[in-house]
């Protein structure tokens, strides 16, 4: 068993990137299984800040091969833009990043349609990043989308792109202002540049498994944004949990060694959708300010609230975590007391599990447990026992409620602001 999977356990922005960065330094291969450049995270390494969107963060490790898997969707110009930004920071990525030839391609027309669909929804808008992710997965599911392998036959490429555009034109008419010929010309320039990066991931990963190489899978988004198990329809368009890993990469369940759920010490969400523990008050504002809760991809302020253990337990039920990484504990250092959600009720009746109906979810009453704050800095802590007693009790309350041990605790933004409890649990 050689595969470690890192997944978001809430609504994204949990800080998966830092743990992925730490684990990538022990890995030979780092993979993305699903999603596109709608996800985003920041890594601080050797005093340099790197922003990642579609690229795996294993690129920070010079000895790590990186794979964008078949379940991903790729906007090729954005791929190169992100790659060039990393290289400007001194990273040598040559021969270390590959895209599956089965991954679907995001075109500019998908991004335009993303915006038009949001306008169509009016007040019921999803709050997408408008990166074209949803429309690309839609054309994938209707079997009309283009994959990376389609880009290298010019005639096939133009025919297939024409069919996609025609379908959107029938729907949106003159509202769709898209120059297909300009896109075709763009890919005449990109085709040769892209060719060295596109591979068949199946033999690549099969060979790695045969050699028992250490493989890291870096999840994008999070379980509560999963198309099947999240707060549908206020979700992304792919399977963001363990299921998406197994279908988006050809690794197989028998290869799994560890499935790690990353949990922020409080809860945040970007975009629309139900958020039972959201705090539209001074507590929410303080979390937003102290936690610097602004999206890497969108620049939007994140909605903030208390830690919701109903969400985390639902996430564990779907992904079967072997360990948790609790992040941004230091953001809570200056609170007198902390609340954690332990159950929901509706019309006086306690609910079992997490509701699938978003209208019901918007009406639930949240039951909280109040825990004492610690009013001491945690950022300097190097070991678990360095943490204040109340902080340790907060960690242990989470463990006992969810039924999974917290193996890593984040107490600051830098790579070394991570406490490992491997020897304590």
Swiss-Prot record:
Query: Binding residues for Mg(2+), per the UniProt record?
Result: 13, 40
Print the keywords alphabetically.
Cytoplasm, GTP-binding, Ligase, Magnesium, Metal-binding, Nucleotide-binding, Purine biosynthesis
Q: Which cofactor does it need?
A: Mg(2+)
Chain sites annotated for binding GTP: 12-18, 40-42, 302, 328-330, 410-412
So where does substrate get bound? Answer: 296-302
Q: Where in the cell is it found?
A: Cytoplasm
Q: Which residues bind IMP?
A: 13-16, 38-41, 129, 143, 221, 236, 300
Q: Name one GO molecular function term.
A: GMP binding
Q: What is its EC number?
A: 6.3.4.4
Alphabetized HAMAP family for the sequence? Adenylosucc_synth (MF_00011)
PANTHER family to which the protein is assigned, alphabetical: ADENYLOSUCCINATE SYNTHETASE
Indicate the quaternary assembly. Homodimer.
So what does this one do? Answer: Plays an important role in the de novo pathway and in the salvage pathway of purine nucleotide biosynthesis. Catalyzes the first committed step in the biosynthesis of AMP from IMP.
Q: What's the protein name?
A: Adenylosuccinate synthetase
User: In which organism is this protein found?
Assistant: Phaeosphaeria nodorum (strain SN15 / ATCC MYA-4574 / FGSC 10173) (Glume blotch fungus)
